[in-house]
């Protein structure tokens, strides 16, 4: 948005249906929202030693998921409003450079060609698929799957010690996974 604030014609290419990239849509923001739930559960348990007993938490996964989505929607909606207010054009899809000053975006509605003088690349990330793991197995989740919070398995193994993996381990443990 800073480019638009400085008077430059600005276009954002976004692969998700809402602005915010990986962090806001399928990364740090949904993870932090779920981590907040885990923290509240753990703090409630810890208060027992101070004489305040809440009992075992009863979790409604559907309501937790809905709340997490509400957090995401509120923030992505805010970004959409900021983009509109600054007259930033948003093109949804995946972009690839086709020339020194040309980007081709493949989206749901076909291809869009964008000509530009300057480009800022903020490509985000995506989960890696390890070749020795059967990804078609519904028990195998990547971080995006874990953030969807479809179920709380009885037991969960987290491979990888990145921040999202650590946070998801914390969340699922607080929700009852071993």
Locations of regions flagged by a protein language model:
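Glycine-rich flavin
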Residues: 2-9, 14-152
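Rossmann-like NAD(P)H-binding beta-loop-alpha module
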Residues: 150-178
């Amino acid at each position: 948005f800073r480019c638009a604030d400085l008077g430059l014609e600005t276009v954002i290419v976004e692969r998700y249906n809402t602005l915010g990239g990986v962090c806001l849509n399928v990364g740090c923001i949904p993870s932090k929202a779920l981590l907040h739930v885990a923290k509240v559960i753990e703090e409630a348990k810890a208060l027992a030693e101070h004489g305040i007993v809440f009992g075992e938490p009863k979790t409604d996964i559907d309501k937790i998921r809905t709340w997490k989505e509400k957090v995401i929607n509120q923030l992505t909606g805010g970004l959409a409003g900021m983009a509109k207010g600054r007259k930033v054009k948003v093109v949804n899809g995946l972009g690839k450079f086709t020339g020194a000053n040309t980007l081709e975006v493949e989206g749901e509605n076909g291809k869009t060609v964008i000509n530009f003088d300057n480009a800022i690349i903020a490509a985000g990330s995506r989960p890696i698929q390890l070749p020795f793991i059967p990804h078609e197995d519904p028990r195998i989740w990547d971080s995006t799957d874990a953030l969807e919070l479809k179920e709380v398995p009885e037991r969960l193994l987290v491979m990888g010690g990145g921040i999202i993996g650590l946070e998801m381990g914390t969340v699922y443990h607080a929700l009852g996974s071993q």
